[in-house]
Swiss-Prot record:
It comes from Rattus norvegicus. It holds the Pfam family Noggin. This is Noggin. InterPro entries: Cystine-knot_cytokine, Noggin. Disulfide bonds join 67-104, 90-140, 96-142, 119-127.
Length: 144
C-alpha cells in the first residue's frame, strides 16, 4: 500500500524495523497450533502434510497475525516526574488477519503513577506534586 509523505518516513521505518526484529514469543495460540491444513487436499486419500511443512505454515500464520506491543520513550515535559515514560503502541500499518481486514488494537493496559507539578493561585500561590494515573498499553490483539 501507498506511503505517507516524507514527514513520517523515518518514524515508519524505525517502527517497521522494531516489528521485524520481534518474533512471535511465548506459547503459540491454540487456534493456530490445532490447524491441520488438510482443507483442499484430495478427498478420501490419507494425505497429510509433513510435520515440518505443517510447522512452517503455522509459524508463517502466527507471524502474520502476531500483534506485538511496540515500546518507545515519551517525554511528558518538565511538569511531570518521571518526565520520560516508556509507552506502548500497537502496529497497525498492515492487516493482522488472513484474509486481510483486521488490525492490531490495544486490548490491555496498565496504569503508571506519575507526579504532576500543579500550582493553585487561590489565597496565595501554593504548588505541589499531585499523583496522576497514566495508562500504558500492555497487550495488543488482532480485531475489527
Amino acid at each position: 500500500g501507498g506511503g505517507g509523505g516524507p514527514a513520517g518516513g523515518a518514524e515508519d521505518l524505525a517502527e517497521l524495523d522494531q516489528l521485524l526484529r520481534q518474533r512471535p514469543s511465548g506459547a503459540m495460540p491454540s487456534e493456530i497450533k490445532g490447524l491441520e491444513f488438510s482443507e483442499g487436499l484430495a478427498q478420501g486419500k490419507k494425505q497429510r502434510l509433513s510435520k515440518k511443512l505443517r510447522r512452517k505454515l503455522q509459524m508463517w500464520l502466527w507471524s502474520q497475525t502476531f500483534c506485538p506491543v511496540l515500546y518507545a520513550w515519551n517525554d511528558l515535559g518538565s511538569r511531570f516526574w518521571a518526565r520520560y515514560v516508556k509507552v506502548g503502541s500497537c502496529f497497525s500499518k498492515r492487516s493482522c488477519s488472513v484474509p486481510e481486514g483486521m488490525v492490531c488494537k490495544p486490548s490491555k493496559s496498565v496504569h503508571l503513577t506519575v507526579l504532576r507539578w500543579r500550582c493553585q493561585r487561590r489565597g496565595g500561590q501554593r504548588c505541589g506534586w499531585i499523583p496522576i494515573q497514566y495508562p500504558i498499553i500492555s497487550e495488543c490483539k488482532c480485531s475489527c
